[in-house]
């Protein structure tokens, strides 16, 4: 049976401004809730870990520690950070060993499985919530992923029929992520913009007719390619947006990074980096050029600068970078051409259901992969991306006469683009 309903992706729609806005400046718009943006990191090995999660936190992004991190480390971190667990890990930790959990604390857990349509998942979550109350701790549960508005309605009823809210957050969206091939190979998907809209309609219905907060918070997961997608997801009714590949393209991500010569490098000093002209460049002040040349001359034989030079020797402006490169190249300090030296750095990004993702978790490929590995250009510093995101979101809210996220989320009109603009998700 073919459903006679049009489904929209983010790029199929555009946000309509209010007739009149009472906002005088975008600076009046508050895009934060309790100090955080409405954004989670995807729990992906090539995005976030126990080593860099604070980079996200200090930029107002909520990190989720992925399943490739040792379980003992995740157990330690769950007292102050979201962590991801497999269903088996979740069942063991919060049911079999629930009596070992420290009382009087709150734990934020993402049960990270691909198929959020399994009833068994929610039955286990209900038991875990019951154990949490008996053992005097608070368990906040995120599950997913789902790709049917009816499943969201079922979860609202599920929460309503229990004496407590079992599922607090739900990730919606299957197959839209850059590292996911579920849709192309398994044919499971629901157009993301329409999915958010339909789930939000259910949420409004239950809030109106039950006067209870029984519906899970909506997390739009997958398919975020640009700032406008974040804005559209929120406008359609998502409480939060989850981002994977875009954050992998930040220099602070945990993905393996390669310079223009395909040489793997490490990043030691985030603050010294800057993005310029499509590549990753070093950050310098006016006097930094001469000083850095002297440092390079002193350390050129150690191999350190030879290894890290694609990130640490390029200047703030491309002209200065070329001048500096000429200096190094003419003195034969570097066995790279200028073109190679100024080449685009890349990051290795993979879905957690890919072969690389499975190996990162268990050390071996365990099943047919529904994810892929890609090498993406490094395009941002995290703080730079967040600065842009905050500015663009405030701008959208000012057009829509919204002073805060509560006014903005789910309360906007969107309209389909012209035919020539539709279906450009992979542009």
Range-by-range predicted roles:
Residues 1-21, 187-220, 225-427:
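Alpha/beta catalytic cores of nucleotide-metabolism and tRNA/nucleoside-modifying enzymes
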Residues 1-217, 245-250, 424:
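Active-site entrance/lid segments in N-terminal catalytic domains of soluble metabolic enzymes
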């Amino acid at each position: 049976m073919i459903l006679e309903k049009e489904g929209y992706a983010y790029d199929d729609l555009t946000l309509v401004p209010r007739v009149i806005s009472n906002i005088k400046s975008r600076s009046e718009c508050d895009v934060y809730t309790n100090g955080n943006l409405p954004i989670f990191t995807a729990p992906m090995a090539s995005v976030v870990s126990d080593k860099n999660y604070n980079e996200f936190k200090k930029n107002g992004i909520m990190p989720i520690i992925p399943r490739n991190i040792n379980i003992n480390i995740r157990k330690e971190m769950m007292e102050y950070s979201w962590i991801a667990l497999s269903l088996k890990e979740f069942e063991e930790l919060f049911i079999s060993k629930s009596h070992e959990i420290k009382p009087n604390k709150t734990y934020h857990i993402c049960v990270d499985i691909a198929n959020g349509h399994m009833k068994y998942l929610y039955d286990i979550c209900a038991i875990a919530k019951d154990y949490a109350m008996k053992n005097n701790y608070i368990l906040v549960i995120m599950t997913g992923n789902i790709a049917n508005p009816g499943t969201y309605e079922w979860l609202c009823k599920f929460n309503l029929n229990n004496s407590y809210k079992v599922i607090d957050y739900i990730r919606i969206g299957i197959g839209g992520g850059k590292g996911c091939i579920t849709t192309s190979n398994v044919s499971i998907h629901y157009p993301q913009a329409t999915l958010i809209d339909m789930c939000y309609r259910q949420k409004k219905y239950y809030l109106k007719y039950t006067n209870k907060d029984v519906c899970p918070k909506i997390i739009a997961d997958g398919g975020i390619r640009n700032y406008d997608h974040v804005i559209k997801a929120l406008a359609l009714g998502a409480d939060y947006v989850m981002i994977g590949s875009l954050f992998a393209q930040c220099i602070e991500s945990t993905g393996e990074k390669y310079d223009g010569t395909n040489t793997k490098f490490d990043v030691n000093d985030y603050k010294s980096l800057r993005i310029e002209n499509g590549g990753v460049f070093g950050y310098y002040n006016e006097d930094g050029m001469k000083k850095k040349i002297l440092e390079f001359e002193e350390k050129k034989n150690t191999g350190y600068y030879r290894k890290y030079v694609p990130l640490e020797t390029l200047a703030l402006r491309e002209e200065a970078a070329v001048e500096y490169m000429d200096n190094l190249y003419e003195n034969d300090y570097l066995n790279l051409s200028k073109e190679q030296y100024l080449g685009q750095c890349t990051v290795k990004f993979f879905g957690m259901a890919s072969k690389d993702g499975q190996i990162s978790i268990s050390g071996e490929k365990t099943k047919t992969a529904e994810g892929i590995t890609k090498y993406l250009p490094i395009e941002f510093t995290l703080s730079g991306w967040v600065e842009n995101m905050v500015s663009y979101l405030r701008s959208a809210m000012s057009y829509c006469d919204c002073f805060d996220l509560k006014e903005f989320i789910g309360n906007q009109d969107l309209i389909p683009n012209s035919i020539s603009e539709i279906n450009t998700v992979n542009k």
